[in-house]
Swiss-Prot record:
HAMAP family: Ribosomal_uL13
GO CC annotation terms, alphabetical: cytosolic large ribosomal subunit
SUPFAM superfamilies: Ribosomal protein L13
Keywords: Ribonucleoprotein, Ribosomal protein
One record GO biological process: translation
Family that this chain belongs to: Belongs to the universal ribosomal protein uL13 family.
Organism: Chlamydia caviae (strain ATCC VR-813 / DSM 19441 / 03DC25 / GPIC) (Chlamydophila caviae)
The organism's taxonomic lineage, starting at the top: Bacteria, Pseudomonadati, Chlamydiota, Chlamydiia, Chlamydiales
InterPro entries, per the entry: Ribosomal_uL13, Ribosomal_uL13_bac-type, Ribosomal_uL13_sf
Name recorded for this polypeptide: Large ribosomal subunit protein uL13
Pfam families: Ribosomal_L13
Function of the protein: This protein is one of the early assembly proteins of the 50S ribosomal subunit, although it is not seen to bind rRNA by itself. It is important during the early stages of 50S assembly.
GO molecular function: mRNA binding; structural constituent of ribosome
Length: 150
């Protein structure tokens, strides 16, 4: 951490961002947007005192029980995920309920991705995100994840 001579602002170096913590967040009964914004803050590193916008200072996040996330109001029946296959008339639309049954991790990943910067740094920070269906995260025991209540 280096301090500039003319200001009191401290600017972190890339070497300061090496010690990364991992957090486990349970998505059971959580609202999609509120959960996603908290995860995005942790991935970017905004929860740290030494946050520097141009350095990947964020921590890793493991989201479990992705299939138990919910939406408020009538959005459960109205929300549609769209993508284009690349072919003529290749626009596909999948309702939220079908996507939740088919690929629940995509729902959370899509929401978090929209809250991250659309730059190389944002893509690098997204690599620290793991979304799991179910509550078993034994494969990540080596990272010594901390259970976080959001």
């Amino acid at each position: 951490m280096e301090k500039r001579k003319d200001t009191k602002t401290t600017i972190a170096k890339a070497s300061d961002a090496q010690n990364k913590s991992w957090y486990v967040i349970d998505a059971t009964g959580k609202t999609l947007g509120r959960l996603s914004s908290e995860v995005a803050k942790i991935l970017r590193g905004k929860h740290k005192v030494t946050y520097t916008p141009h350095i990947a200072m964020g921590d890793g996040v493991i989201v479990i029980n992705a299939e138990k996330v919910h939406l408020t109001g009538a959005k459960k029946g109205q929300k549609i995920y769209r993508y284009y296959t690349g072919y003529i008339s290749g626009m596909r639309e999948i309702p939220f309920e079908n996507m939740l049954a088919k690929k629940p991790s995509y729902i959370i990943e899509h929401a978090i991705k929209g809250m991250m910067p659309k730059t190389r740094l944002g893509k690098r920070q997204l690599k620290s995100l793991r979304i799991l269906k179910g509550d078993c995260y034994k494969t990540f025991e080596a990272q010594k994840p901390i259970l976080l209540d959001v």
